[in-house]
């Protein structure tokens, strides 16, 4: 009798743990939008097959959504696929989103969510949305979840125009694109996604073909934070722009979890400009920067990640132009990360040999407060054969250099000049 009660309890628990799959279908309606408008607050099935659209699909209200094995093809490069705005508990599951051949390049997202709460985007496949915007973009959202999605080929050739900034003062050709972008959002979970770029990898041939890094415009006066060599050469090495995952707005973003994602061939793997962030159990493979936290990022826990074949840094912490006295960087932990095959990435030819697996840097402007109080423990830099880096760890010096860094119980394979450019204090 006791075992029967346990079994019955288990059945009841599991039957309640998973909601019944949606049964209402968009089939029979003139369009997916018409089906949503006729069924507010319902999650509708998009059946297998191709469903072409030329205008974005708008999801609003509470409890609406789309799910199913259908493929939504956006034929208009001037529109995203889905726009979710001022909504609560919207679900988007199991869909494929694509653009037709010849219309892949766009300046728009595939999914954009604005001022949403309890949003779920799960098991969605987004292929060949070549955009300088985030393929999945969340703005001013709370408690959203993006899980088990595939974003493949999200970059495009673009112009990064910094001529309006006194700090920079130039525009240049670049590759650009971000797979998942969070801006001014809190309480979000980004887990178990696969993000891969297979087209615009940083080879010499791709650079020459598109003139990547070449200035296309330059102000009469040199930017305040631009070095003379770059300015006079009319060329920037940093022509890989964008990130696989970026979290923006450190004063307005918090409680973000980036867990168990697989990232391949990104420019920057994970780019953090936020407070109270967990970056854990991710793979970042063949990015020129594995991850960085800057522009006033505080209380960032970087734990248990693997960084493979990164080219400039695997992990970098530093202030930036977004940092100020009320928005400083630090109070963070870097623990139990494994860095391997550093310097073997596709972008290694760009950056020379003054790179390092770990970089703790000073700010970009004189008034940037220094990075402070970071615990670095239990990390491994693994190197087989001759190292392709000068030091495993570089810590910037000077009055504005990092303060209060503590290193303990790490295994750092030395570079050709040693483990670090400074003594690493426990």
Question: Which positions does each model-derived feature cover?
Answer:
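Bacterial N-terminal signal peptides
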Residues: 6-16
């Amino acid at each position: 009798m006791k075992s029967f009660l346990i079994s019955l309890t288990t059945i009841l628990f599991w039957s309640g743990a998973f909601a019944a799959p949606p049964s209402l279908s968009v089939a029979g309606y003139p369009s997916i939008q018409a089906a949503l408008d006729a069924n507010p607050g319902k999650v509708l099935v998009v059946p297998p097959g191709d469903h072409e659209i030329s205008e974005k699909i708008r999801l609003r209200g509470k409890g609406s959504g789309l799910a199913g094995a259908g493929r939504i093809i956006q034929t208009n490069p001037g529109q995203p696929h889905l726009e979710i705005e001022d909504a609560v508990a919207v679900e988007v599951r199991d869909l494929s989103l694509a653009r037709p051949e010849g219309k892949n390049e766009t300046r728009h997202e595939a999914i954009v969510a604005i001022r949403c709460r309890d949003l779920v985007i799960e098991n969605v496949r987004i292929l060949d949305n070549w955009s300088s915007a985030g393929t999945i973009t969340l703005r001013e959202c709370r408690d959203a979840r993006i899980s088990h999605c595939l974003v493949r080929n999200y970059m495009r050739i673009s112009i990064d125009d910094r001529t309006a900034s006194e700090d920079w003062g130039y525009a240049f050709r670049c590759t650009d694109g971000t797979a998942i972008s969070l801006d001014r959002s809190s309480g979000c979970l980004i887990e178990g996604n696969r993000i891969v770029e297979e087209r615009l990898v940083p080879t010499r041939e791709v650079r020459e073909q598109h003139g990547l890094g070449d200035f296309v415009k330059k102000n009469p006066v040199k930017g305040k934070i631009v070095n003379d060599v770059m300015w006079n050469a009319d060329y920037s090495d940093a022509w890989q722009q964008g990130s696989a995952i970026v979290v923006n707005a450190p004063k307005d973003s918090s409680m973000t979890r980036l867990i168990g994602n697989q990232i391949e061939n990104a420019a920057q793997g994970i780019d953090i400009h936020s407070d109270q962030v967990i970056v854990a159990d991710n793979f970042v493979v063949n990015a020129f920067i594995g991850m960085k936290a800057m522009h006033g990022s505080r209380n960032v826990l970087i734990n248990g990640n693997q960084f493979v074949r990164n080219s400039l840094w695997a992990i970098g912490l530093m202030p930036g132009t977004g940092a100020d006295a009320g928005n400083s960087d630090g109070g963070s932990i870097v623990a139990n990360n494994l860095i391997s095959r550093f310097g073997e990435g596709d972008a290694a030819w760009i950056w020379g040999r003054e790179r390092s697996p770990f970089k703790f840097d000073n700010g970009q402007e004189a008034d940037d407060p220094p990075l402070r109080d970071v615990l670095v423990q239990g990390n491994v830099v693994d190197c087989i054969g001759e190292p392709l880096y000068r030091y495993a760890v570089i810590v910037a010096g000077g009055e504005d250099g990092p303060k209060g860094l503590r290193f303990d119980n790490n295994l750092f394979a030395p570079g050709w000049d040693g483990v670090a450019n400074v003594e690493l204090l426990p």
